[in-house]
Amino acid sequence: PFPALDDVELKWAGDDTSSSTDPYEDNRQGCNAFPDNFFDGDVALIRRGVCNFAIKVNNAAAAGAIGVLVYADNRPPISMGGLEATTIPAGFLYLSPVDAAAFADYVDLNAPVLIDMTATGRYINDDWGDIKADFSYRGPGANNFEVLKPEITAPGLEILAGVADGVIDDDGLVQAELYQGTSMSSPHTAGAGALIKALHPDWSAAEIKSAIMLTAKNTDLLKEDMDTPADAFDFGSGRVNLTLAGLTGLVMDETYDNFVAADPAAGGDPKELNVASLQNNACVGECSWTRTFTSVAGVPA
């Protein structure tokens, strides 16, 4: 995290053209070494992209920077991973495309730009939730089976999670880190299933899965551009809503034998499976499916 700073110069990395023979190319992304003392006690302003964060920060530190501010445009905010081997603080600044260009231009054209910075704190913005990660899998399934993929989505971007035993901070405490990817989304989904199983120990795996899918949040979900509404090939049935899943009034069951019989390689038809999704690759205009629900709310289905 950044310490508090007072009247420190913010210097744009793009002022360095020493690493290129083309005068129109610069080192704004900080992926090449800067000249000695290029920053000399300044905070470096570096654009995201091309190389990883550690390279940017270490290049700036070697040139005398006391901190790094990485800016990016048109992407959801991210955590700056891989900084364990760096020696100066670094932060991430998310801006719109227009604001990012204007900000860099201002710092470049109005040097020296002095900044004050309070100590790093926590900022929560609910608008950054339910946005599809740009690295996440999209449907339909790779084998074109007539079963919707992905089926369900869970939080998997910028998750505050405990790290493995043995990773400790300077105070001897086990750290928490921000992680992302399948390593986050998958345990959220598995954990949701385990909790539903604890509530309803008599339910089958298929019933538990259907409870999670049938109650998922499927509105106000966005693609990675943070603007375009997401669709079923982005989120499947939606984002896990564990509270509603535990209160579902309907579930769907399916047998092992039926899953085996639905194998297309053996002449089966996956779209006939009693699952909580509907997909028909040959559907033109109008098509139909048959599904069977079981009431678990104490009233007839």
In which residue ranges do the predicted regions lie?
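Extracytoplasmic/secreted envelope proteins and their assembly/folding machinery
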Residues: A54-V57, A100-A104, K132, S186-G193, ...
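Structured lumen-facing ectodomains of secretory-pathway proteins
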Residues: P1-A154, G162-A164, A232, V240-G246
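Marks the mature luminal ectodomains of secretory-pathway proteins
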Residues: I88, D126-G129, F135, A142-E146, ...
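Short coil/turn segments at secondary-structure boundaries
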Residues: T118-A119, E224-D227, E272
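Hydrolase catalytic cores
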Residues: F53-L83, T153-T228
